[in-house]
Amino acid sequence: MKPDLSSLWQECLLQLQDQISLTDFSTWLRPLQADFSVQNTIVLYASNVFIKQKVDESYLAQLTKVAQELSGNAELVVQVKVGVKPEPKPAQPSALPTHHNKEENKPQTVIRSYLNPKHVFENFVEGKSNQLARAVAQKVADNPGEPSSNPLFLYGGTGLGKTHLLHAIGNGILSRNTNARVLYIHANNFMQQMVNAVRDNKMDEFKKFYRSLDALLVDDIQFFAEKEKTQEEFFHIFNNLFDTGRQIILTSDRYPKEIEKLEERLKSRFGWGLTTAIEPPELETRVAILLKKAEEKNIYLPEEVAFFIGQKLRTNVRDLEGALNRVSANAEFMGAAITIDFVRETLKDMLALQDKLVTVENIQKVVAEYYRIKVSDLKGKSRSRSIARPRQLAMALSKELTNRSLPEIGKNFGDKDHTTVLHACRKIAELREQEHSLEEDWSNLIRTLSV
């Protein structure tokens, strides 16, 4: 039996969930709102232009095909627009601040937000690795409580900017509504507050406080793992805030479904809104971050030196800033100019560690394990797609993550010519723009190699 219009979109989602990765599904398709008010047309509302463009480019044809097949209507048209579905879903909460019951609507005292005023959108350096996260964070700050992005779940490795964005969202909300009750808290501090409340017999006050918030920002939610009592209480707080349209923003070092010993009901709720990854910054972004930080600290950092540091240190923003602070302090103490030679000497231990962590051999091993092939296959001559593509990817990663020259990389891949390596790098760069699955593989491998 063909689904009626009210259930067609849900049927589409169920089918599409089996066709694309869970990360892509949660990021791009799940937040869309479907409207059937126009005959023979499904209008999908995206929360911002960035999501609309991505859906148009990567998923619209697939969406249209599935919708036509499920509806039995070959003339059905699927469109994507930026905005909110005209008629709100009855089951969904309204946007902040139209919330609270009569008792909660009483005037609330101002609370301490624990936000860092230095972490704002204006000084967050944007690049390809964090572009989507930056866009959705801004959207949440502008329209807190919007159902399509509530909760907002940001995940990625240590030192990539999750906490900065978390504070930027909170500061953005407060800049638009100074009376908003916004709280930033680390997961460990939440647990400690709860322990204290139980000890002091003040759980009622604890619950009342958290349920009075307009926006709750919890950092490093993965620390709730194994803490059954904490998870139980947070479950009820989450439900109360979500059901009344208050904004929830969470960060973690991993995708919610990958957090072990966290209740399934919490994992499910964390995926109700928008889940977005922050990847390790690419070279251009690393250089931009260094130059921005140097400008903020009034440090003269020549661009070629920033480029040198960015090439050598590839892990995260925190390491880049630490390196800059060390270079600046040593230069000031010694009265020396900041040159490439000076940086090489000052950071020699950090650079040696980085070179030791990421080698061509290590990349080959990780890529081989990822694609379930042998390292010898990567060094061989097989032109089979199942071997050639991972080989090209491993070459491109070697160029990106190590300081080896093209001839040196080629030598490690069975004495391949440097032009073969160059072709592989260009091919992978091209395919990353065209095939989202390859871009996801690239990001997963970068993340693994950057640990």
Swiss-Prot record:
GO MF: ATP binding; ATP hydrolysis activity; DNA replication origin binding; lipid binding
Region (Domain IV, binds dsDNA): 332-451
Highest taxon of the lineage: Bacteria
InterPro entries with a match to the protein in the record: AAA+_ATPase, Chromosome_initiator_DnaA, Chromosome_initiator_DnaA-like, Chromosome_initiator_DnaA_CS, DnaA_C, DnaA_dom, DnaA_N_dom, DnaA_N_sf
Region Domain III, AAA+ region, residue ranges: 114-331
GO biological process: DNA replication initiation; regulation of DNA replication
Family that this chain belongs to: Belongs to the DnaA family.
UniProt cross-references to PANTHER family, sorted A to Z: CHROMOSOMAL REPLICATION INITIATOR PROTEIN DNAA
NCBIfam families (alphabetical): DnaA
Comment field on protein domains: Domain I is involved in oligomerization and binding regulators, domain II is flexibile and of varying length in different bacteria, domain III forms the AAA+ region, while domain IV binds dsDNA.
Function noted in UniProt: Plays an essential role in the initiation and regulation of chromosomal replication. ATP-DnaA binds to the origin of replication (oriC) to initiate formation of the DNA replication initiation complex once per cell cycle. Binds the DnaA box (a 9 base pair repeat at the origin) and separates the double-stranded (ds)DNA. Forms a right-handed helical filament on oriC DNA; dsDNA binds to the exterior of the filament while single-stranded (ss)DNA is stabiized in the filament's interior.
The name this protein goes by in its record: Chromosomal replication initiator protein DnaA
The organism of origin for this protein: Pasteurella multocida (strain Pm70)
